[in-house]
Structures are given as C-alpha cells and as structure tokens.
Amino acid sequence: MGKYNLILSEYLSFVYNSQSAVQIPIYYSSNSELETRCIEFHAKCVDNSKKGLSLKPLFEEYKDVTDNATLLSILSYSYDKYNAVERKLVSYAKGKPLEADLTANELDYENNKITSELFQSAEEYTDSLMDPAILTSLSSNLNAVMFWLERHSNDIADANKIYKRRLDLFTIVASTINKYGVPRHNEKYRYEYEVMKDKPYYLVTWANSSIEMLMSVFSHEDYLIAKELIVLSYSNRSTLAKLVSSPMSILVALIDINGTFITNEELELEFSDKYVKAIVPDQTFDELQEMINNMKKIGLVDIPRMIQEWLIDCSLEKFTLMSKIYSWSFHVGFRKQKMIDAALDQLKTEYTKDVDDEMYNEYTMLIRDEIVKMLEIPVKHDDHLLRDSELAGLLSMSSASNGESRQIKFGRKTIFSTKKNMHVMDDIAHGKYTPGVIPPVNVDKPIPLGRRDVPGRRTRIIFILPYEYFIAQHAVVEKMLLYAKHTREYAEFYSQSNQLLSYGDVTRFLSSNSMVLYTDVSQWDSSQHNTQPFRKGIIMGLDMLSNMTNDPKVVQALNLYKQTQINLMDSYVQIPDGNVIKKNQYGAVASGEKQTKAANSIANLALIKTVLSRIANKYSFITKIIRVSGDDNYAVLQFNTDLTKQMIQDVSNDVRYIYFRMNAKVKALVSTVGIEIAKRYLAGGKIFFRAGINLLNNEKRGQSTQWDQAAILYSNYIVNKLRGFETDREFILTKIIQMTSVAITGSLRLFPSERVLTTNSTFKVFDSEDFIIEYGTTDDEVYIQRAFMSLSSQKSGIADEIASSQTFKNYVSKLSDQLLVSKNVIVSKGIAVTEKAKLNSYAPIYLEKRRAQISALLTMLQKPVSFKSNKNTINEILRDIKPFFVTTEDNLPIQYRKFMPTLPDNVQYVIQCIGSRTYQIEDSGSKSSISKLISKYSVYKPSIEELYKVISLREQEIQLYLVSLGVPLVDASAYVASRIYSQDKYKILESYVYNLLSINYGCYQLFDFNSPDLEKLIRIPFKGKIPAVTFILHLYAKLEIINYAIKNRAWISVFCNYPKSEMIKLWKKMWSITALRSPYTSANFFQD
C-alpha cells in the first residue's frame, strides 16, 4: 500500500511515543474467508493489548491478512494527555526569539503587541483579527513539522541541504514560540484571552504562515525569501505583502517577447515566432527603483537584491524567480483589519468639486447605453425571465445571511436564524412578504456589513442587503450576464473564453507599433465619486428600457431594479466599533448586490472607453482590443509608427492625468510586452498565475468540518503546485492524517487509511498520486465504496421537523404552483429537495447530520458492511471495461512549446506532447435541446442529475414533464418524436459522465482531450451503433493514457476489443450511475 499508510504509522509512533501507547491496525477484505481472518486478527490484537502483550507474534500468525487484505484504519490508544509538543519544541528552540517592532504598522492594533496591551480584559478581547479560522491547531502544525524534521535528519546530499534550510527556519519559529509557550486552542480551534493574554497577539497566525512557508522551502532562493518574510511578517502585519508584490506590475513590462502563443480566428492557441522589444521609458525605471527603495526601508535585503540582480539582463529564464517572490509574498497570511477601518478607508476619500464634468457625463452615458444594449432584446420581446423575475429570484435565493437574526416558528419548533431563505418562508407564512416594496437602507435602517480579507490588500466590506434586493436584481442581472457571455470585452464572462485564450488575445496584437494600457481600478470601484454617476447611469438606462415595452410585468421588474439603485444612493451602514454600533452614511459602491460583478464590469468598460476617447483627441491610433476582467481593464492600442520611449512616456502621463481629472485613484501603466492584472500576468510572451492560496490560515470560518477542510487544504496545495508554489507533500499528508482522525474517547482515536481517503466515496479527501484521479476497480475498492454509500445521506431531526411544517410546505407549494402548469412530481420533489438542502447552512442541522455521519463512519471504519443497491458507481462501469483493455508501450514526441512556465514537469510534459485545451468541456447539460427548450418557456433550470434522470424516462413521461414546465404541447410532442431527442440522450449522458470524472478540474482542464496525438494511441474496433459505449471506452482509454504519462513521463497505446454482447449490458448500466459528492468534490468546486 502507498506512502500515506507508511507515514501514518510512523507519525503515530512519533506522537504517541510513550510506553502505554498502542496501535492496532484494522484490515478488511471483500473475500469472505479472508474477512473472517481480518475480524479474528483484530479481536486478538485488542485482546493482547488489554493484557499488555506484544502484537508482534500476531502479525506473524496473520501474515495472510497483512499481505492480502486492505488496511482500513488504525486504532490508536494512549494514556498520557500529551504535552509532548512543548517537550519536543524545546530541543528545537536553540535560537534567539524574534522581537516585534511595535511601531511597524500605522494602526496600533496591527502591531504585534502582547495581547493584554491591545485588549485590557477578556470582555474587550476578540480573536477576529488573528483567527486562523481553520480546524487544525498550532500544536498540530508544530508536531507535523517536527515529525518531518525527525524523519529526515539523516538525509544525505541535496536532501540534507533542504533539511538544514528548514531546520534553520524552524529554529526561528520554535525559539519565538517557546519563549511564550505554545498557545492552547479550545475545542473549536480558537485561541481565548486566557491563553493569549501574555503572548503576542499575532503569534498563532504568524506561526501558521511561517510553518507553511518553511515547509515550502526547497532551494537556497526559497530559503532566503522565506527567511525574510518569516522574520519581517512577525512585526509588519499590514504592508509587507503589498510592498513585496508591487514591483511585478512593472517587471512584466521589461522582458522582450521572443516567440509566443496567439489566439487565432478559430479560437485556438497557435505559436507565433514574433519578436517584440520591451520599450521602457526612464520614468518607469525610476518608479521601480522607488518600489525597491520602499522594500529596503522596511528592512528587506535579499528580495530587493534578487530583483535588482534580475534587472541586469531581464531574462525570461530567470524570471521564474520573480514570479516565485510574487507568489511567496501572499503566504504571510491575511491582513485582517477592524471593520471600522475597512469602512472608513472608503469614506476618507476627499471629494473635490474640481472634476471634469464632461468626462463624468460621458462615463454616465456610456454606462446608460451599455445597460440599454444589454437588456434591449429581452425587454422588447417581453422575455419570460423578466416577466417571472420574482419567481426566478425565489428559486435561486441563497441561504446566506439576511442581516438580522429572527425568531421563526416552524410547526412546533421555534428557531433563531439569520438565513435569507428562512426569512422568506416566514414572511410568506405571515403575509409580510412584499417583493414589490424595496426596503430603504437609509439612516433608519442601516445596512449590516460582512467582510472580505485578502493577503496584501486592505480588508473590504460587503453589504448584507435584505433579500428583496436580490429578488429585484436577479432576473435582470442574469440577462445582463447572458449578453456579456457573447461580448468579447467581458473577459470573465465571455463564453468561449478561458484564461489561456484571453492570454492569446493580448499577445496577438502586440508588435513594435502597439502598446498595451493596463489599469487596476479596484480603488475606483469603491470610491465615492463613482457612486452617483454609476447609479445614475444605470437608472437612466432602466428608464429608457421601460419605454420599450408595454408589458406591465416587465415594467415592474425594471422599476424594482431602479428602486434598488435609488435606495442605495442614500445608504447608511452599521459599523461595529468595539461595543458600539456606529451609523455612517456610505457613499461608495460595495459588493453584496447581485449586480456587483456585472455592474462593475460595465463601469470599468465605460471608464476605459472614456479615457481612450480623451487620448484619441491627441494621438492617432486604432484600439485593437478592450477587455475588462473584474477590477482590471486593459486595452491594446495600435499606432501608425513604431513606438519610442518618449511616446510611451507621453501616453502614460496623459492617461494618468485623465484619471486624475476624474479624481480616480487608480494605477495605470503602459507597456509594449506584458500586463499584470489580479488574475494572471503576462511576461516575455508567457502566461503566469499567482500561487497565493494560504494553506494554514483561512479567510473566514464557514461550517465545513475537519474532513472538508482537509480536502480543501489538499485542493489548495494542488492549485498552488500547478502555479509554481510547491509545499512538501509529506507535510500535507501529515496534516491530512491529523485532520481526518476521529476521536472515540479521550484516549482512543481512529485514523482512516489511504484506501478510505482516496477511494471516490462520500469521504474522499485526496488523490494518492498528485494530479491523477484514480477510479478504483479492484474488488476491495468497489466493496468499500459500496459500504460508504450506505451512510452518505444522514437524517436530521430538525430538518425533518422544519420540512414537515406548514410554513415550509406552503412555501414549496407556492413555488411549484407558480412554476408549473400541471402536476410534475419530479420538479416539485426537486424544489422540495433543493429547499431542504438550503437548510443545511443552518448550523444546528448541519451539526446534527455530521454527528450522525461521524458515528456511522466510526462503525464503518471498524467493520465495513457492504451495501446492496440498484445504483451503480462510475467505478463499476470502469471495472466492466477494464478487462478488455490491452496496453503496450508507445511513444509521443514533444511537439508543442511551453507557454505556462510554472507548471510541474510531468504536467508540462503531457501538455507539450498532446497540446493544451482552450475550451471548457460542457458538463452541465445546458447545450442539450431539452435544456434549451425548457429555458425558452420556463425560469426553472434542471440540474445535470435531473436531466440525466428525465431523459431516460419513457417518451410519454418526458412529454408530460415538458408540458408541466410550460412548454406548449406541440413543441413537447415534436421534441419527443424527433431525432433530436435521441441525440440529447447521448449529449446528456456524455455531460453527466464528464461531470462524474471531474474532467474540468485539477490539471485535466489543461489537457486537450480531443488531441489527434492522443487519439492515435487508441485502437477500438467499431462494433455497431451505441455511441454512448464508444464514448465511454474512448474516454477511459484517454484517461488511462494520460494518467500513465503523468506518472511515468512515458506513453502507452491502448487496444480494446469490447464484445458486442456486453455492449447492450453496459449501455443499460450507464443509465443508473449515481453521483458521489465528497469533501474532495466540494473542495474542487470551491476552487472554481
């Protein structure tokens, strides 16, 4: 068995190293005779350990079990409440503890003072500014590091260098923590006043970040970067990450492009050997020098030195070090400010009357025209989504907070909740539901605030608006996004696009006479000057649209939307400041509306168009592309002569002056070769991503359990690794060991084995081989998968009680009645299930389900019972196929050039052989005709699971399903009678299988699955027309080949002679595949 189990048993003997500690392995087998031996073996182990006898003779006696059965879990038993961490830590605490500079940050509480100096008493204390918000403790993290160090203390050669580097860095951490003692966490993994009062306030979050950084050290450069960040982030909790990552916006403009990929007319990336020289005016170098000086000012030495050394020849080869520094800077942890400072930051902007009114006017008009353009067609055609906008809003209502806690009665049960969906049900039940009235958010009813924390930026505030705002905006915004989907300017929403094509989009037009202007407008989006022109533009657009229709329902939808904008122009917010809640007038735009993303994009587009129209008064150029992506916008301008330093200098200064005329505090840059925006950056014709996901600190506490967080940790590790920031895998596995263990009693713990955590069951947490998703097909794997299926869905008493209450039932039937023309059990049941699922975000229900699941899991981890079901898993389908596959060694030449330098070697190799994918594989079923037919007449959106179920029904039932959703009978019967229906059957099955095989996640999303190079390695004789079977055989063959290539950097070809007699059987089986949701899949989804 794999490396995980080895690390597991070593880790257990490392942590529980006393005489009294016992570890009992538990095995299982799908073979009933061997299973009996497994049970005997376990019983005797328990017996021996009770008598204090050695387990060694049993391992001899039961060699058949240890050789042939599968390890299920390890039961660990230890008397001593261990303060082992402190004891072990002392031997590493040989260095000088760090001393915090208590004047390093502007805001007093951001200095790393002793907690009792920041908070005089337990009442005043809050951990919200330093809460790691992750369900694992500092002591576990220290244990994991010391375990790694102990395991590798005898490494030789290069491995020994890594050991020494990490040991040296850990000495700093250990010495500092040892000075104050290891802070003990409570059962919720929080650090209370009593524990923290005599320790530096930021000790825990700093130590977590430092551990994450030191366990990501491999080379000498890593060591220098990490050391500097670890030492300085102990004092500087505010600006360090920002200062370290600032230079990147200029560095991208310094490298010549020598060969790059461009997007061609067919929306594919193709190589172009063009050469573009980086033309850099002196002023740019001055700005860069100033950034470097600012870095030196706060005590950085090595990082600015590395940047300066790179500047000598600005080579692309050595640029990876620059991108490394850029990624590392985020790992110092989140900057968490007090809400009052986060809010006042946006209120402090001085408002000047001296602005260019003409430009503001143009800006407002552009917003107005864009809104009209986006909504014109749906409004003129009286689109059903706009007519039923309220219903559409209710169906997609989230279970997020509604801003206030309320007492709600469900039948006999009374609960307190802040959730939107529960408030809606409550209001409907009491006749207080008035979607036609948008509640004011003025001084009488100020908006409660949420927060968003990011490394290297200030904390931002989020409006928590009443649900009426969501209902009013939902349908209209959906229509706006639909327009954005086929408008290239909106890089985020553009349907055919992805990060790679957007990259080829820019490089396509770069040449000696083109410059690219890129601006970060995040400050502008939340500035006060933006709010009046912004909201007014939207309001004017909506007024124009109202005159284009006579349908009262559409007019009503537009009017409600307009009302949200009017209300928000006079908005007040509640800001907690200590124990008081302050009311402040808030003039800026904040996230929290449904329209945030769409409206910001529209405004950014209007802004850059306004700027370009001013520049055009002075220069003659053609605008080749304009793109907006979130807070960033960029444009490529083509001039009729070659560019000179002076031209770039002039354009740059003019652009800045224009922004200044609008009092927009933005960072505008001009370059000839590269850009840097929040999501990605382009340098030397290659594309880079920032690998800045924190592993051991989280932004906020959600209601995910330790298992979920272990899966998220692994998923974050994978994303960072693909982007060029690698953390030691053994360390990650050790964290998974810690976070997935289940306590039975104080001294008894159960540790699941690799098989449990990597089989795709409801408990999957990670992959045994990075980047490769395995679908186990052996008897033992399928057996354990079936065993876990039985305990996937747990009941919750509270949820059942709520669901059986009149309040809940009335709400569900209200939705069904509004949605359906005639009875439709599938949809009504679907709505009820969806609404019941929304209840999961209510903590008591979640906890109840989780407890039930953990206790079932405990039973299962000690003795699995396989479970009979008529559902198949994808594993069983693949198990039927596998025996007919014959593989032989083969080879593929490297034929594509690198364009993403940060990728790990094995992934890079596969892409260079088969090419990269520039399209999303459709895995939602939305391209099928039935899905399009439904969306033409109804606001209801069936999930891929529902479509999969419906499309396999009898034709009569499908027709009834369609008619009940408002599809006219003639369309429905025409659909069932046509050939399209059988094509749909195939399309939906295809989407469903893609969805199950996570083809759009991890590194699979980078590979071209339709690559002709890949196809030629597969030989499957064609036998009769069952396209679905042909499809799954091909897909499985491709996965086998790609997985083999990732693992071995070598290629195989696959021959499959699938018997015709088996094909029908397989085809029937393919219509009863069940989807498995696990912490692993939700972590993948969460990455999205």
From Swiss-Prot:
Keywords per UniProt: Magnesium, Nucleotide-binding, Nucleotidyltransferase, RNA-binding, RNA-directed RNA polymerase, Transferase, Viral RNA replication, Virion
Gene Ontology MF terms: nucleotide binding; RNA binding; RNA-directed RNA polymerase activity
Names of required cofactors: Mg(2+)
Catalyzed reactions per annotation: RNA(n) + a ribonucleoside 5'-triphosphate = RNA(n+1) + diphosphate
Database matches in Pfam families: RdRP_4 (PF02123), Rotavirus_VP1 (PF12289)
UniProt-annotated location(s): Virion
Assigned EC number: 2.7.7.48
SUPFAM superfamilies the record matches: DNA/RNA polymerases (SSF56672)
InterPro entries xrefs: DNA/RNA_pol_sf, RNA-dir_pol_4-hel_dom, RNA-dir_pol_luteovirus, RNA-dir_pol_reovirus, Rotavirus_VP1_C
Superkingdom of origin: Viruses
Domain RdRp catalytic: 501-687
BP GO annotations: DNA-templated transcription; viral genome replication
GO CC annotation: virion component
Subunit structure: Interacts with VP3 (Potential). Interacts with VP2; this interaction activates VP1. Interacts with NSP5; this interaction is probably necessary for the formation of functional virus factories. Interacts with NSP2; this interaction is weak.
Function: RNA-directed RNA polymerase that is involved in both transcription and genome replication. Together with VP3 capping enzyme, forms an enzyme complex positioned near the channels situated at each of the five-fold vertices of the core. Following infection, the outermost layer of the virus is lost, leaving a double-layered particle (DLP) made up of the core and VP6 shell. VP1 then catalyzes the transcription of fully conservative plus-strand genomic RNAs that are extruded through the DLP's channels into the cytoplasm where they function as mRNAs for translation of viral proteins.
Similarity remark: Belongs to the reoviridae RNA-directed RNA polymerase family.
Protein name, as recorded: RNA-directed RNA polymerase
